[in-house]
Amino acid sequence: MSAEAFSQCLEAQAAAIARRQGPDVGVDPETMRTRVRSGRWQRLQRGVYAAFSGDPARETVLWAALLQAGPGAVLSHQTAAERHRLIDEPSAIITMTVPASRHPAQVKIPGVIIHRSDAILQTRHPAMLPPCTRVEDTVLDLIQIAPSFDDAYAWICRAIGRRRTTADRIRRAMDARKKMRWRRELVTAIGDAGEGALSLLEYRYVHGGGTLARAPLGAPAGANQAAYR
């Protein structure tokens, strides 16, 4: 066993390891099975283990799902929003995206929603681990499945209001997409959010013919006030 390679693998993946990775780090499948039977390791997904006993951390669970999904998989949508701190509580369901070349039947994981995309290389964050979509593309993915434009705009407000990204970055990411729901409305909405209209009330007031008194520099996001005449 290559102790260094094995240790590095576990450290990089929050102590999750796939059976297929064993030969690369000097651990044979029988050794893995023995450790699971002895209770030193535990099975998290089919062919994926946690190299410890006890309750797995959230990051270990996410890594296990990604390893089960196979090469190229990234966390996306609500789970990516969790990683980017756009939501405060993790969902019981993990959401990820795999390359479009993967057949849906090849990627069926209990408790996981799978999307497919041919643009993963462009939308994947260059540094985050576990692999995850960029915050701008996470927002756009959530907009694509939003039940209404109000819900879509709320994601934009949240991302900008929490200072996770900017209006310009969201706009550039949207320009790179061939298909986008509510594209025309979103162009306007992104501009409004960039100007400080970080709530649906403010957005509707602006487009109802009113104006907004801009909040002082440094005021909390969404602190603009309607200026009635």
Spans of features found by a protein language model:
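Short gly/ser-rich loop at a beta-strand->alpha-helix junction or flexible surface loop bordering the NTP-binding
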Residues: 1-184, 200-206, 213-219
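A short, highly charged nucleic-acid-interacting micro-segment common to nuclease
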Residues: 188-203
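Short acidic loop-to-beta-strand element that houses the catalytic metal-binding Asp/Glu
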Residues: 219-229
